[in-house]
């Protein structure tokens, strides 16, 4: 169990580059830039395999979201526990060109 009282946590964003990305995530939102002009996604909160949000502030700094959920699922998820992982992926996109429809029926 996590003995720490809940507090507003900040997470380090994960930056993803693609051929359709741009520079707006860094210029408009101040996100770290790769310097290649193809920064497409800033994953703000994620618990998906090896892609993990890491707490950057407070007593739990350095812990991943998956670590916190495995230690004490109800501390993060409350009574809405869903298969042991955080149920949402929160991200910003910079689509520097028109994209095709993307469907993820199994997710």
Model region roles, listed by residue range:
Residues 1-107:
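Transition-metal
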């Amino acid at each position: 169990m996590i003995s720490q009282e809940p507090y507003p946590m900040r997470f380090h964003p994960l930056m993803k580059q693609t051929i359709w990305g741009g520079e707006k995530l860094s210029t408009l939102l101040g996100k770290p830039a790769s310097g290649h002009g193809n920064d497409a996604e800033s994953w703000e909160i994620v618990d998906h395999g090896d892609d993990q949000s890491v707490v950057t502030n407070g007593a739990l700094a350095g812990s991943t979201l998956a670590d916190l959920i495995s230690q004490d699922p109800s501390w993060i998820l409350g009574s809405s526990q869903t298969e042991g992982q955080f149920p949402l992926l929160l991200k910003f996109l910079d689509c520097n060109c028109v994209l095709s429809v993307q469907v993820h029926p199994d997710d």
